[in-house]
Amino acid sequence: MPRSLKKGPFIDLHLLKKVEKAVESGDKKPLKTWSRRSMIIPSMIGLTIAVHNGRQHVPVFVTEEMIGHKLGEFAPTRTYRGHAADKKAKKR
């Protein structure tokens, strides 16, 4: 179930402070964060945010289409390597 509109978007306070500081100074360095649960807000447009996926920080460049989504949606946590091949089918 989606979040109620009257509550507004959730964003961690420490991340919000980092975003405001980066926008104010015009800094283009990636912002490191572990907060995958924070929602992308309009003030983040044009920033690169390095989102932690459990192993490393994945750089995510924020665009207009991403507003309203969560940061974790753009940093996949699992790698799919495909299913094991069938040995009988390989011989044919």
Curated annotation (Swiss-Prot):
Gene Ontology CC: cytoplasm; small ribosomal subunit
Keywords (A to Z) from UniProt: Ribonucleoprotein, Ribosomal protein, RNA-binding, rRNA-binding
InterPro entries in the cross-refs: Ribosomal_uS19 (IPR002222), Ribosomal_uS19_bac-type (IPR005732), Ribosomal_uS19_CS (IPR020934), Ribosomal_uS19_SF (IPR023575)
Pfam families: Ribosomal_S19
Protein's GO biological process: ribosomal small subunit assembly; translation
Keyword Cell division: no
A GO MF term: rRNA binding
Domain of life: Bacteria
Keyword Protein transport: no
Coiled coil residues, start to end: none
NCBIfam families from the UniProt entry: rpsS_bact
Function as written in the Swiss-Prot or TrEMBL entry: Protein S19 forms a complex with S13 that binds strongly to the 16S ribosomal RNA.
Family the entry assigns: Belongs to the universal ribosomal protein uS19 family.
Protein's UniProt name: Small ribosomal subunit protein uS19
Originating species: Vibrio campbellii (strain ATCC BAA-1116)
